[in-house]
From Swiss-Prot:
Its main location: cytoplasm. It holds the Pfam family ZapD. It comes from the Bacteria. Cell division factor that enhances FtsZ-ring assembly. Directly interacts with FtsZ and promotes bundling of FtsZ protofilaments, with a reduction in FtsZ GTPase activity. The keyword Repeat does not apply. Belongs to the ZapD family. It is found in: Cytoplasm. It comes from Erwinia tasmaniensis (strain DSM 17950 / CFBP 7177 / CIP 109463 / NCPPB 4357 / Et1/99). GO terms for biological process: division septum assembly; FtsZ-dependent cytokinesis. The lineage of its organism: Bacteria, Pseudomonadati, Pseudomonadota, Gammaproteobacteria, Enterobacterales. This is Cell division protein ZapD. The gene is zapD. Interacts with FtsZ. Keywords: Cell cycle, Cell division, Cytoplasm, Septation. GO terms for cellular component: cell division site; cytoplasm.
Length: 247
């Protein structure tokens, strides 16, 4: 069992959206083997929420810009003496490949939008108990077809998300790796600092302290207040060490 807990907090709307997409993609992957009604509703609810997020802003454009920005960062690293050029070229090739795939891909989530079953379930999810067999006979019979056929259909849906998934996972990995966890000290449960040019805060706390961070901030500055998990009897130490990475 882990003795630490890692928290992440976005410092801009772009990163907030990306983290939500990552969360939903992971939920879809974890629930892709659908064997019953409960599992189906979990999958379709996540699919519907993902399509809702896809509707917000210039998502593809922002990701393509970040892919280009990360390539430029790698080029600047190439000028550092002793740097591993093999790693730099490998990452640049991955970034270029993701950009090419994303440019060539249709509208994000288009296959899921056009899938009649997903559309039917999505319409009923907002109604309390609205996904009973008499409400959605299509889903009811789909859950009784052979498991292999159902798995194949779900796999096709998820494969259609590969361009956005691969690009986003690579970008988030590079962004997370750009910051190193360092020890800091909060005074009376409070800490603040500058975050010029950063997209993401990562905080690692000891589980035994039973504290969690409440973060407020934007692209230039942030503040963290630590609160006890037990709001009635818990206490926050006057001085409290934690690890923080500004990415």
């Amino acid at each position: 069992m882990s003795t630490t807990v890692l928290f992440e907090h976005p410092l801009n709307e772009k990163m907030r959206t990306w983290l939500r997409i990552e969360f939903l993609l992971k939920q879809l992957s974890a629930s892709q083997i659908i064997v019953d009604h409960q599992g189906a509703l979990t999958f379709f609810r996540n699919a519907g929420e993902l399509l809702d997020v896809f509707e917000r802003g210039e998502l593809r454009t922002e990701i393509l810009k970040e892919l280009e920005r990360q390539q430029q960062k790698l080029l600047s690293w190439a000028e550092v003496p002793g740097v591993d050029m093999t790693q730099i070229e490998m990452h640049r090739a991955k970034l270029k490949g993701c950009a090419t795939s994303l440019i060539a891909a249709p509208r994000m989530g288009q296959l899921l939008r056009e899938e009649r079953l997903i559309s039917l379930v999505r319409q009923r999810l907002s109604i309390p108990g609205g996904c009973c067999s008499f409400d959605l006979p299509t889903l009811h019979i789909w859950l009784h077809i052979e498991q292999q056929l159902r798995d194949q259909q779900v796999a096709v849906w998820l494969d259609s998300l590969a361009p956005i998934r691969d690009a986003l996972m690579l970008l988030l990995a590079l962004i997370r790796q750009s910051g190193i966890l360092r020890t800091h000290t909060s005074l009376n449960g409070f800490f603040q600092d500058n975050a010029e040019g950063a997209d993401l805060l990562r905080l690692q706390l000891r589980l035994e302290d039973a504290l969690y961070p409440q973060v407020s901030g934007h692209k230039s500055r942030y503040a963290i207040r630590f609160l006890p998990l037990d709001s009635e009897r818990g206490e926050v130490p006057a001085r409290f060490n934690f690890e923080l990475a500004c990415c």
